[in-house]
Amino acid sequence: MAAGAPPSSRGGPVGAHDAQVRARIAALAADGTVDAGAATATWRTACAAAPWTGAPVWLHGDLHPANLLARGGRLAAVIDFGVLGTGDPACDMLPAWTLLTAASRELFRAAADVDDATWLRGRGWGLHLGLGAVHVYRRTNPVLAATGRHAIVEAVADHAGA
């Protein structure tokens, strides 16, 4: 499907980021930002999901609200192609946790038509990038930090409700 295309830095196994995610969970739990137990359980489930075995597919890799432009309540454009490449489509499930709520997430999942393992890995990407946004931006960019907090809350709640 994407033969010869460059791999995305976010197209590999979500579990490859285990050390960084666990360190961020610990750091953010220390100041009360996250529940370490719930976040770790969410992360473990994502890492235990079956890996992507299909052909690499094109992916944006950074589909969070600041990169999704809307007009009249509808998606009008996608911007910031800095991590564009190929790999596991799970990373592009990111809007399910960075943008949506439980009710709208179900509609997104149905439209995306992905298997359970891809969804679980996608949830892991949501948690990972949410933790990263809070860690990096909480003092400098309140909008991205809020997106990160939303992703963490939604990923953990989605895991708890699964």
Listing of model-derived features with the role each one plays in the protein:
Residues V83-T86, L94-A162:
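Helix-rich C-terminal or lid/interface subdomains of diverse kinases
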Residues W43-M93:
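Active-site acidic catalytic loop and adjacent metal/ATP-binding pocket
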Residues M1-G4, G32, A50, G72, ...:
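A general structural signal marking secondary-structure boundaries and capping sites
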Residues A38, W58, A146-T147:
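Alpha-helix N-cap and coil->helix boundary residues
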Residues M1-G37, A50, G54-P56, T86:
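A cross-family kinase active-site recognition segment
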Residues A36-C47, W119, R123:
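Short, well-structured alpha-helical segments
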Residues Q20-R24, D92, A133:
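A general alpha-helix detector
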